[in-house]
Amino acid sequence: LDAAAPGITVRMERELDARILTPYFTSHFWWMGNGDEPLCNWTSWCTQNVLLTVFLLPTTQQQRQAAVKQAAYSLDCFLKDYGADGCCNEGAQYYRHAGLALWGCLEILSNVAPDAFRPLFRETKIKNIAEYICNVHVEGPYYLNFGDCSPLAGRCGAREYRFGQAVGSDALCALAAEDFRADADPDHLQNSDATTHINLWYRLTTAFAEAELRTYTLPQPEQNTVWY
């Protein structure tokens, strides 16, 4: 990057420090959690993106430890608002910024401290959060909707597939693989929700999972009745 635009990496690091790292370490925002107040998808979504920033930049060990501590606390506050059934009370359209961003947080934390965080994927509640999107799927691109949630909640793909692998869910892996193959725009370049394609980590996750998604053997679907 510096060869093409001298000084750009220094500018990027300076802006990320000013806009993300310094505010995160010196201020308290409501989505970080502070007791019993209800939280939403902002918590997991913002926390995921902060963690990406912290661990991709040449941050100090002290900053990294502080980020892990705050992220773990924020996710505890986020999870308190989920029942054991894993229902996303914001609906299917918000799943990708709520439950799926929770996967992003845990995936990053598991790579940083695998012994501490990887076992969390074996928790029943985490698996139920992962499989919520399967349980409200109707057919093709359609989902059960309520509130301000669209019935066209967007296709599943690589992140759902990796979440399914992490929690041991054949149903989620199958839905993700089937949806990815059926998607005429798997890179989401035409999606009006720009958050699905401007995140380079999402794009890399898709790139590294594409071969698996295209060759995954789809099991016979199970007929389950789920109540939320």
Regions picked out by a protein language model, each given a short descriptive name:
Residues 1-93, 203-218:
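Active-site lining segments of carbohydrate-active enzymes
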Residues 97-228:
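Carbohydrate-active enzyme catalytic cores, enriched for enzymes
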